[in-house]
Amino acid sequence: MAEFSFSDLEAIIRDRAHSGDPDSWTAKLFARGIDKAAQKLGEEAVETAIAAVKGDRQGLVSESADLIYHWLVVLGLSGVPLSDVLKELESRTGRSGIAEKASRPKG
């Protein structure tokens, strides 16, 4: 069996986004817009951090899955493909994190 990837999840989200399926959480999030999706992303980020601090391995796995899903929803609503994020990450791999951060525009 092939491994499930972020790209697979991105495709599922794209397919369900405008499906009109009343049972689809993805369709509901897209219908509610970026404000609701961003709120959910923030909530999941906090829950992920809490699970990590508590040392709750299963909670961290579960909340991380929620976080990644909601992050991809926000990207989709914003019209930013995952490939753009991956290209940005790739461009940073040849530099130290400190040098990369220093090279970012101020503001």
UniProtKB/Swiss-Prot annotation:
Catalytic activity entry: 1-(5-phospho-beta-D-ribosyl)-ATP + H2O = 1-(5-phospho-beta-D-ribosyl)-5'-AMP + diphosphate + H(+)
Enzyme class of the recorded protein, top EC level: hydrolase
GO aspect biological process, one term: L-histidine biosynthetic process
InterPro entries to which the protein is assigned, alphabetical: HisE, PRib-ATP_PPHydrolase-like
Matches recorded under CDD domains: NTP-PPase_HisIE_like (cd11534)
GO CC terms, sorted: cytoplasm
UniProt keyword Hydrolase, yes or no: yes
Subcellular location, principal: cytoplasm
Compartments (UniProt record): Cytoplasm
Enzyme Commission number(s) of this protein: 3.6.1.31
Domain of life: Bacteria
A GO molecular function held by the record: ATP binding
UniProt pathway annotation: Amino-acid biosynthesis; L-histidine biosynthesis; L-histidine from 5-phospho-alpha-D-ribose 1-diphosphate: step 2/9
Keyword line: Amino-acid biosynthesis, ATP-binding, Cytoplasm, Histidine biosynthesis, Hydrolase, Nucleotide-binding
HAMAP family: HisE (MF_01020)
Family stated for the protein in its record: Belongs to the PRA-PH family.
Protein name: Phosphoribosyl-ATP pyrophosphatase
Organism of this sequence: Mesorhizobium japonicum (strain LMG 29417 / CECT 9101 / MAFF 303099)
